Design a protein with these regions (language model features):
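Histidine-centered nuclease catalytic patch
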Residues: 92, 96-99, 120-150, 160-174
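Generic detector of leucine side chains in alpha-helical contexts
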Residues: 20-28, 52, 56, 83, ...
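Mixed-charge, low-complexity interaction segments
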Residues: 1-77
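Short, charged surface segments at domain edges that flank catalytic/cofactor-binding sites
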Residues: 67-118, 145, 168, 174-180
Length: 181
């Protein structure tokens, strides 16, 4: 019986090590701007139920992802020679998006190296969400310095009114849960 228990324990340890390695690698590659604290691994080391332990670790990562401090800061500008004739005129605050909005969104996305400004995940133009440093309702304009590029998860977080609902709706939940073996 003792040998059998040792074999199971070794197999569990290998599976857990693989889970943790995959999780850390995923977060580093897909959300490089989010600094994750993995102390939860040590805190849960005596947990016998491996799936519960993995779930607790994932919950900790999701909470850290949600609570990661993000400041709406003025963004980098685009070189003047790349701007078009009526750029300044269409940058003024207006409740309606300017007719050149698609171009502005693409320029901001390229300026941000095709990445989410908050977490650093690589996104394609169709997945990119935009937010404003200073909201249009508050007098912000459509100039590049006011446009932020975000992924779907960070857009939900930045615009969150109810943290619990937002956390449960993040795509990141499903992705991380898929690492449980």
């Amino acid at each position: 019986e003792k040998i059998f228990k040792t074999k199971i324990k070794t197999k569990d340890n290998e599976a857990f090590s693989s889970f943790l390695k995959d999780l850390k690698l995923y977060m580093l590659q897909h959300h490089p701007k989010i600094d994750i604290d993995y102390r939860i691994v040590e805190k849960t080391k005596n947990e016998e139920d491996m799936e519960l332990r993995q779930t607790l670790i994932i919950e900790s990562i999701i909470k850290q992802f949600f609570n990661f401090p993000y400041q709406n800061e003025t963004q980098a500008s685009i070189p003047r020679e790349k701007l078009w004739i009526n750029y300044e005129e269409k940058s003024k605050s207006n409740p309606k998006y300017p007719s050149d909005w698609v171009l502005r969104k693409e320029f901001a996305w390229k300026r941000d190296n095709r990445c989410c400004n908050r977490c650093g995940s690589t996104i394609n133009i169709n997945e990119a969400y935009t937010n404003f440093v200073k909201e249009i309702n508050d007098g912000g304009g459509y100039n590049f310095e006011n446009i932020m590029t975000l992924c779907i998860n960070c857009n939900k977080i930045v615009n969150s009114k109810n943290p619990n609902i937002t956390i449960s709706s993040l795509d990141l939940n499903d992705k991380l849960i898929s690492f449980i073996k």
